[in-house]
């Protein structure tokens, strides 16, 4: 079902390998959006490619959302390839659930880096092209599960 409102737009969906992110990526693709879904591994990117197979302009890519340079490079590549980036869905997330008194600093830092700092980094990366095209949507997803 193509949706004339979204058809032809370009979306970047982080954490698109499974769960909420996979559902968002597939739903957007079904509505005619060119979806670039991110995964933390090449295997995950392959799963996204399989899920979006046959949909023009859709693909999975590997991205460390905690790497600012990689995020900037991906956004630049998307804009260069498609001429625009209309939608960012910040969905990537992790959890390191345990009692606070047992949580290690490294685990806490990893959760904040992925669930908070990466949202800022990716949002910052898309702001310039979105402002230049005078259109853009940033959607931030949270979950109790975190992944």
What are these regions (language model features)?
Residues 10, 17-18:
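Conserved glycine-rich cofactor-binding loop
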Residues 31-47:
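Conserved glycine-rich Rossmann-like NAD(P)H-binding loop of the short-chain dehydrogenase/reductase
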Residues 55-57, 77-88, 96, 107:
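A glycine-rich helix->loop->beta "capping" turn
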Residues 62-73, 105:
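The beta1-alpha1 cofactor-binding region of Rossmann-like NAD(H)/NADP(H)-dependent oxidoreductases
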Residues 99-100, 107-112:
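Substrate-binding pocket helix/loop in short-chain dehydrogenase/reductase
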Residues 123-124:
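A short, exposed helix-loop element centered on a Lys and neighboring polar residues
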Residues 139-147:
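Catalytic loop of short-chain dehydrogenase/reductase
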């Amino acid at each position: 079902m193509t949706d004339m409102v979204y058809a032809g737009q370009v979306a970047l969906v982080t954490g698109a390998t499974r769960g909420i992110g996979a559902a968002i990526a597939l739903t957007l693709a079904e509505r005619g959006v060119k979806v670039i879904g991110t995964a933390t591994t090449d295997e995950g990117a392959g799963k996204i490619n399989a899920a979006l197979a046959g949909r023009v302009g859709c693909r999975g890519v590997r991205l460390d959302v905690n790497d600012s340079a990689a995020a900037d490079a991906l956004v630049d590549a998307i804009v260069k390839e498609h001429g625009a980036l209309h939608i960012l869905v910040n969905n990537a997330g992790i959890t390191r659930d345990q009692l606070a008194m047992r949580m290690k600093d490294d685990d806490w830092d990893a959760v904040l880096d992925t669930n908070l700092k990466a949202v800022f980094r990716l949002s910052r990366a898309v702001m310039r092209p979105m402002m230049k095209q005078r259109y853009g949507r940033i959607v931030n997803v949270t979950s109790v599960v975190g992944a």
